[in-house]
Amino acid sequence: MKLYNKEEFLKLPSGTLFIFGPAYQEALLEPAIHSLNIKYESMTNDFVYKALVDIDADSSETLMDIDERAQKETRVNGISSNIPMDLECTTRDGFYEEKATYIVFDNEEIKAIIASLQTLVK
């Protein structure tokens, strides 16, 4: 993994696997708390990406309804019903944060992630 500043990250090609990194002033790299994302096109100080794991909701209201239902079910039953997953939707970063950083994975690391996930498939 390598940590990139925003200027260098925007130069990377479409199809780059990354997680959002810490801001410059933060002390720790904690990739375990962030989800994997795929970077697509870069724009001036912005970019398009897709989270590998996201909730399928067609609006903010629907997302809030799903969240509320899942949390209520978990409080009552200890587990929620299925939460719909979205594997297709892309979004713009849209924060224009100059000091943002990104942790980027190389091909060997991506292969290792895939191999690790394949051990879970039954």
Place the predicted regions along the sequence by residue.
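Mixed-charge, Lys/Arg-rich low-complexity intrinsically disordered regions
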Residues: 1-9
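Low-complexity intrinsically disordered segments
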Residues: 44-122
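Short, surface-exposed terminal/edge motifs of secreted or surface/virion proteins that either
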Residues: 24-47
